[in-house]
Amino acid sequence: SHFAPGESPRSIQLYGTEPESVHRAVRMLVAEDRVDHIDLNFGCPMPKVTRKGGGAAIPLKPRLFEAIVGAAVSSSGDVPVTVKFRKGTDDDHLTYLEAGRIAEAVGAAAVSLHARTAEQLYSGHADWTAVAELKAAVTSIPVFGNGDVWEPWDALRLMRDTGCDGVVVGRGCLGRPWLFGDLATVFGRSPASGGSEPDEPPDLGDVAVAMAKHARLLVDWAGPHGIRDFRKHTAWYLKGYATGPAARRDLQSIDCLEDLDGLLSGLVAAMGPDLPLDPGALRIPRSHRNGPRRVVLPEGWLDDPDDATPPPAEAEALVSGG
């Protein structure tokens, strides 16, 4: 891992299925002073991950889950370790309360709940009631809620309705990095705010500036691959702006920063820098919208919940979100 000079806090999310490898990874990150915070992700619902026994499948084995989280905490020193998970694999296999209690007992600094099951993937609505139940069950460390935070007011409602200590933002910030500034404003943590109204959504001209900056930073960090990775972000940024399908199609074919600059300049000139966002687009999901889909598990995975045997080594090679 590497971070920009002065970037703080240096936070990294780890995915692992085997306690010893997680222990070694955390020990290395801490010993080399590479991080200020480590998050463990047990939320990935994708079949390629769960069928190998990774991601959202791990909390079904509470002793294995305990061993992995404990291995991370035991090697983290003063660096806080947080844990993210889903409600469970499906409504018949809910694991979030036990997972929260285990993480609390072995020394996690906080837990985060994506309030959907793995079967839901990213469909339907997040079950904020589950966040409230987790908050009631886990009493000595912070509990964060995740799911359906599209606007700053969603975060306030989630905290008010559940009593949780904070929120985790996922898809809501894709194409809308200013959501974090809006959250700081409504929480009263912005230098210009005492807990006030956020700014109006940016017009097209400001979005184009943000897109160009984002792309340059991504290329600086990832090299030539960065511009290809940025292609998918262009649709997320422009969702809700009446720019037309041709512009979106062209932007998703860019090969270099010069392509992006030329297309953005032409788009702003044609549509006007003051083109506003359709307010109804704020709540349109970006990125994943698939689901529900039956969760695929390794054969016999549910036979013995107390079995702490890690899944095969190939499960460690799979990486995704949650």
Feature locations, PLM:
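Short, structured active-site "lid" loops
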Residues: S1-L14
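Residue-level preference for short coil/turn positions at secondary-structure junctions
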Residues: G6-S8, G77-D78, T139, G223
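Conserved residues at beta->alpha junctions
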Residues: Q13-G16, H125, V149
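The beta1-alpha1 cofactor-binding region of Rossmann-like NAD(H)/NADP(H)-dependent oxidoreductases
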Residues: E18-E20, P152
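Alpha/beta enzyme core
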Residues: E20-G54, I58, P62-P142
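Alpha/beta catalytic cores of nucleotide-metabolism and tRNA/nucleoside-modifying enzymes
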Residues: T95-A110, T129, E133-G145, V149-G322
